[in-house]
């Protein structure tokens, strides 16, 4: 059973260690290829420091997700842990956090440590926690596997996106998009569509490393070779998924090697020990 200390340490290794290592390794090459990028990225010590703590300065733009995940997971676990020791029901705590997330959503906050993204996505994270508490009841009420529900949620998502893209009500678009994705996933599960199953263990590795191959296919290659846009996009998609997947498989196969274990550790990967 986790304590707050052990839980936070686990998430530091899983999320923050890969963030620091990969950001540091990526910083210099990203700055050297500044001329090929859409936005300036200077090779300075100040910019390096900012790239570790400000989400709008990161060399890999979507790595804010690691900081946000760490903050939300750690805070939520600690709040639930200490409220549980005082015999407060988890549902009451989660509802309180959900209300708090809704209240702070319009407030302007700093991008330091991706706090602004915590504000943006906190409501949806806590809503997911609430769903996990009552999933059995909710699933009885929502026809996830009905094609009509999938179609309706997809239509609502598109319509709300067009209506509220730059509106405070855009969170409705996100909710319908989440419902659409959940419905599609349930339909795939029910019909045993398993063509993506080979990727599931490597999804975190794909997230961590896909950016390199996306950039190589879309920007670096395009700088030297003029190909149709769909070729660059297809190469980016395939390389961004399957090269990290191959890397994961290699680490998994050679986990008895000390260097491989170290590499796996700093990338936040964990493999079951072989019998």
What does each model-identified segment do?
Residues 1-3, 78-85, 104-107, 127-139, ...:
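Structural signal for the C-terminal ends of transmembrane alpha-helices
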Residues 14-74:
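Membrane-interface helix-loop-helix regions
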Residues 53-68, 106-127, 158-180:
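Interfacial loop-to-helix transition and helix-capping segments at the boundaries
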Residues 73-98, 130-151:
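Solvent-exposed interhelical
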Residues 188-200, 213-275:
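C-terminal "closing" transmembrane helix and its immediate cytosolic amphipathic cap
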